[in-house]
Amino acid sequence: MSLSRINIGSFRNITSASLQPCDGLNLIYGQNGSGKTSILEAIYFLGMGRSFRSHLSQRVINNDDDKLTLFAHLIDADRDCKIGLRRHRSGEIEVKIDGEKVKRLSTLAETLPIQVITPESFSLLFEGPKARRQFIDWGAFHSDPHFYQAWVNTRKVLKQRNQLLRNQSSYNQIQFWDKELVRYAEQVTDIRNQYVDSLNVLLKGIIGVFLPRIDIKVSFTRGWDSKTDFAQLLENQYSRDLAAGNTGSGPHKADLRLRVGNLPAQDALSRGQLKLLVCALRIAQGKLLKQQLDKNSIYLVDDLPSELDAQHRQLLLQLLTETGAQIFVTAIDPQAIVDSLSSPPNRMFHVEQGLVTVIE
C-alpha cells in the first residue's frame, strides 16, 4: 500500500501543493519553518482526521482561508482508493472515500494506517498511560473487527456511570451500568491483551537489534487487579467512586508497562535509548499489521538527523526499508539521510516557504 498522489490546500503555510511520491523512501528536506513537517502532518490528517502536532485542528488551517483541503490517491494490492478531506475553521469536517461520504473518522484509520516517529513521539513513554492506551488501541482496532464497537460501548457506559456518580446516585441505580461495564470491559481487555502478546513476539527481536545488551520487559496491565473479580471490585469501590465522582478502576486505566529490571524504562534508559525504544515499538506495530492483515503502514519520520546519531540513524532506516512500506522522512540537510542509506532515496522533495519541488 502506498500513496501515489497527495494534494494539499491551505494547510499551515502550504497554500497549494501536489506531490507524487514513490514506493519506498521519500526524502523531504528544507529549512526550519519551510513546511516540510506540514507535509507529514497533512498525510497524518488524512489518516486520522486530526494533527499530531496540535489538538486544535483550526490551527492547521492557513490564515488566509477558512478551510483546508486534502486529497490522496492510495494504491493497494487489491484496490485503488481516493480519499478527500475538508476541514472548516468552524470545526465541520467532510470526508469522502471513493466519492462516498464517510461518517466515522475511524474509517480513515482503517483505510490509511499510519505510524509516526517525531521528536514528540516520546510522549508515549513520558505522558502517562493515555498515550500508551492509544498505542495499544490503534493496534487492537486493526487486529480485531470487534474491538471498535466494544471500545465505543465501554466509553458510553463509563460516561453514564460517571454521570450517576456525580449525581450521588444510589448503588441500586448504578448496578445495571456496572453489569454493562463488566461485559464490555472484558471484551476490550481480552482483545488488548491478545494484541500486546502478539506485538511482544515481534518487539523482542527489534529491541534486540536496537538495544542488544538491555533486557526490556513489556507487559499489559488491564486497569484493575487481574486476580480480582471486576464486578465485585466496582461494588466494593462504589463509596470511593461516589466521593471522587468518577470510576477509579477499569479498562480506561489500562497501560503498557515497559521495564528494565525493577525500574520503568523511562528511569533506566538514556534519552537516546528511549528514542530507539519508541522506534522499535512503531516498527513492531507496523510489522504486526502486515503480518495479520497483509497491509503495510505508511511511516512518517520527522527530523530524523536531530533525533539519532549516525549509526542508529542508519540502523533505523535499514529496518524501515526492510518492512517494504512507504516511508516519508524529513531533514534539514538531505545529505545526512543520503549518507545513512545503502541506496539513494526513491524520491526527493525540496520545500521552501510552503512551495514543494521534486528533485530529479
Swiss-Prot record:
The keyword ATP-binding applies. One of its GO terms (biological process) is double-strand break repair. InterPro entries: DNA-binding_RecF, DNA-binding_RecF_CS, P-loop_NTPase, RecF/RecN/SMC_N, RecF_2. ATP binds at G30, Q31, N32, G33, S34, G35, K36, T37. It is found in: Cytoplasm. Keywords: ATP-binding, Cytoplasm, DNA damage, DNA repair, DNA replication, DNA-binding, Nucleotide-binding, SOS response. SUPFAM superfamilies: P-loop containing nucleoside triphosphate hydrolases (SSF52540). PANTHER family: DNA REPLICATION AND REPAIR PROTEIN RECF. This is DNA replication and repair protein RecF. It comes from Shewanella frigidimarina (strain NCIMB 400). The gene is recF.
